[in-house]
Amino acid sequence: MDSSPNDGVHQPLLHPQPSPSPPESTNGELETVLSDVETPLFLRLRKATIIESKLLFNLAAPAVIVYMINYLMSMSTQIFSGHLGNLELAAASLGNTGIQVFAYGLMLGMGSAVETLCGQAYGGRKYEMLGVYLQRSTVLLTLTGLLLTLIYVFSEPILLFLGESPAIASAASLFVYGLIPQIFAYAANFPIQKFLQSQSIVAPSAYISTATLFVHLLLSWLAVYKLGMGLLGASLVLSLSWWIIVVAQFVYIVTSERCRETWRGFSVQAFSGLWSFFKLSAASAVMLCLETWYFQILVLLAGLLENPELALDSLSICMTISGWVFMISVGFNAAISVRVSNELGAGNPKSAAFSVIIVNIYSLITCVILAIVILACRDVLSYAFTEGKEVSDAVSDLCPLLAVTLVLNGIQPVLSGVAVGCGWQTFVAKVNVGCYYIIGIPLGALFGFYFNFGAKGIWTGMIGGTVIQTFILAWVTFRTDWTKEVEEASKRLDKWSNKKQEVVPE
């Protein structure tokens, strides 16, 4: 049921409510082309590919820029820290990959509930609900951030308990203390990001992130080298940079004409139905966390090897490069989530299915090219992070595994994006548990420790889990009944926009 201004469901505190206009990406043009059986198949596919490519790249290109620049901020912080010494590099790597990614995965995962609901609500033209979903998610993520703060505060004893060396654990905890403000930036940023993406508004975030990157680099240089603030200064600057992005994006939302229909001002509805929203957010969080924590465990296991500093340095450099390239796939992930959820919400099953095919092709080709580049530059990659010859040789030795990971990243994140667009988070979470934690991690530990293959063995085993997970998601996506998914999306929208559901939590 659509909510109206006076139905008691949504009582805005700011701004009048204008009449909505149909979203450009779901105007039915692509569905019409794909359904035109009188046109030869080749001509239909060519025209549909042109339409979808335009829609996709209008979403994906700015989204890739946003994710890559956000990741570059963390990557540059690690580079600044690494040039202080090998211990500082290991500490920043462990703090970033071992602690920060824990929070990042949880908060981004919970924010993905907004991606499903806002995307389908926008496609179904239930615009007034988007602002409510944004605010409700921010409330939930802020409460979650309070709990995560405890992990940051007690990061040193946690790392020691996990078997990390005292020197690295102590330095990493200092780095992590400066990242505490970043937790609450995540709580605001991820819902805002998904709110904008669901409306195909991505370019402003790209501009904001690009400008913030230059500010971040300047402030990092001042804090680390000129003011001598070391690891703590580097992480505090990273937190500040994330808050700059949050504030700038929110100012855009409340002042932009493009968000006039979806942002109706602050609403008390943000505090109702929290338990029902939490259950959906938790399913999204579990799905994504099981993925992000998987490679976090890879780095933690490397810290238990015979030469932990070398293993951490070499593996974390590879993971940083992988993560940077992964941001391209995450951009495609965001694009396909929006495309699928919008088309399902608008009742266009053929368009949703066609979008999945096109984005997988583009993402895979991009990542294969980058994997080839990585292999060609394997002997010089590490010198951007550290000057050590020993670390450089270790990184070069791991590059073939890095290339395989990049190719898998051309498919797997996109399939996860399809899952978010369709609302399959619970199913994917179960697949991730089986493939990652029942198969991948035990295999990695077996190869790395029992057979003494070290970091290469750990990584090889865990790649095996990723391969199985990718095949399962590809098979399920291939067999999807998209007409049925349209019906499920309609039911989901009716549930979440129903007046009684909004007022009374389940």
Swiss-Prot record:
Alphabetical list of InterPro entries matching this protein: MATE_euk, MATE_fam
Keywords in alphabetical order: Membrane, Transmembrane, Transmembrane helix, Transport, Vacuole
GO cellular component entries: plant-type vacuole; vacuolar membrane; vacuole
Protein name, per record: Protein DETOXIFICATION 40
Gene name of the encoded protein: DTX40
GO MF annotation, one: xenobiotic transmembrane transporter activity
Transmembrane segments: 55-75, 89-109, 143-163, 167-187, 201-221, 227-247, 285-305, 316-336, 356-376, 401-421, 433-453, 458-478
Signal peptide (from-to): none
Location within or outside the cell: Vacuole membrane
Source organism superkingdom: Eukaryota
Family under the similarity heading: Belongs to the multi antimicrobial extrusion (MATE) (TC 2.A.66.1) family.
Organism whose genome encodes this protein: Arabidopsis thaliana
Region (Disordered): 1-29
Main location: membrane
Membrane topology: Multi-pass membrane protein
